[in-house]
UniProtKB/Swiss-Prot annotation:
It comes from Saccharomyces cerevisiae (strain ATCC 204508 / S288c). The gene is AIM20. This is Altered inheritance of mitochondria protein 20. Involved in cell cycle progression and surviving DNA damage. Belongs to the SKG1 family. The chain crosses the membrane at residues 6-26. It is a single-pass membrane protein. Its main location: membrane. The keyword Transmembrane applies.
Amino acid sequence: MGNVSVAVGTAVGIPIAVGVIIALIFWCKLQRRYKKEEIRDADLEKMVMEEVAVSVYDGFKAEINSSSEASTINEKEANQDLKPCQEKTAKAGYTPAYRRQLNASMGTLRPKKQSTAYTNVPVIFSGEKVNYGMVRDPSYSFMYPLTLSRKETSSLRSASTSNLSSSTENTALHEEIKLDDPYENDFTNYTVNKREFIDSLRPH
């Protein structure tokens, strides 16, 4: 009996033990394979995440570059639009140096308008006579010239046709003498020319 039980136990136990051992071997191999696959999957996932991050960064960078390029283009267009206006204002407001000098020289050469109102009315002091058609200014030492006022053509014609005496003509001429512009005293021969003109009007 003992031998039979040993034989049955060995006949049954040995195959079972072998099967268990084989199963353990396959299980260990599968576990190693699973670990390798997990490591590989982790590496693949890491690579995918890196690629996604790089692509997202590249897209964001491209968007920033496009926006900056658009802003620079808009600024350039705005500057180009403003340049003609600035050039027009500069051309309108700028005056060359030779033009300014020419305007200044023309201003100096242009005669000033003489005022018809006298600041100091020339008078004749008592006891002082008219000296060759000159009258003294009370505030200054120089003399103002006296000149004839414009005659009417009718008075000239009547004076030329009438045969009055020299004393009557002199009286009429002295009554028509009035004070002329004080700035004409620069012409020293003004009175002489006036007297020659008066003498030429007298009938011979």
